[in-house]
Amino acid sequence: LCLMAARQKSKGSNLLRRLEEIYEEFGYTESITTAIVYKKEKDRERMSAIMTSLFEGQLRKAPEWKPLIKKEFCFRQQNMYMADLQGGNRLIIRPSGTELKLKIYIFAGGSTRDEAIDTASELCGLARRTLEEKNE
């Protein structure tokens, strides 16, 4: 960190300005982690059924997700579903290893921080609604 600061100072800049330049060039990224929590041990089967439906491509068939998903990755051995979404965004769903919950990870980008946050929030809400519907 000290070397980076010294280098930027020698160029008449500083770390904050350099970080702003990087954001201008590459955009902002926001990540959100959330989970659907289950209460009973028997819900483990429900979680398993949801993961199986993801592995079988059911999310891609849902009208609200169809235009968003570019490519799906199913890591059955790790029990993890991942989808690359339009705009360079990403969705990951996997069960917790220690608790009765499905974890949802969203990674979203934007040309501004607010845009990245808004996109991540929208995708997170959509993922939660979709999984909660499958939960009923």
Predicted regions and their residues:
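Phosphate-binding and adjacent anionic-ligand microenvironments
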Residues: C2-G97, K101-Y105, T112-A120, C124-E136
